[in-house]
């Protein structure tokens, strides 16, 4: 990969040539976040990179996740992005902080990397990320149930960051190793519903408690929100006698980014076109990736997400 341009971001707010926002995921799940970003920021351009060749990250070691994420971010910076969103919980949990603190200051100090974990933690704790020490949430009580990949659960990042901000909250987690492969393989609804029900049951039985909130800690899982709602109603509703709110990342992260860009307008520019454009990159087989696009981001027009639009990189 070529060395990134370290020049300062374009300071203008509107241009025919915008600084695109980079969105990265280990595979296709990040398309759910991209779709929400496109709807919330319609006049911005986006570059999406899916590292399908190395997916899923949930089964990788920490050093492997860090290095693959670093290379992906570097690629998006080299394409002209000043801001990259890690639309991957595993990458956000394992690689983001090290990238921000150790790599970014020397490689591209004028650029920024954000993750999808922070907005979720802020939402569940009702505390800004940077001000929790002054004003921890002392009164919020209950149990948060988090469903995520093995690597995200193993990192304990959600657990640690939530407990910092809301020490009275209990946090219980459940790894769901079969959900991403099932979605990528387009398994039928009966299969995915059964898998989800099994994981919800495991969470409750293993911890001997039921969650007051469910957090879907993988960008693939919004596609299974209905399945989680049904499983929660069946297993948890029978115990609590009420429904359980389910927090999904796409809309929460999109609203958070919109607010962030109001405070940091120098990082990207809106195009003067009525609609921004999106360019798609993959490290995998472009034809195979195209076939999965319709389930992960149904709002994308087929012509926009066709195989000719997915650019395969080495």
Model feature map: region roles:
Residues 1-314:
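Non-catalytic structural scaffold of enzyme domains
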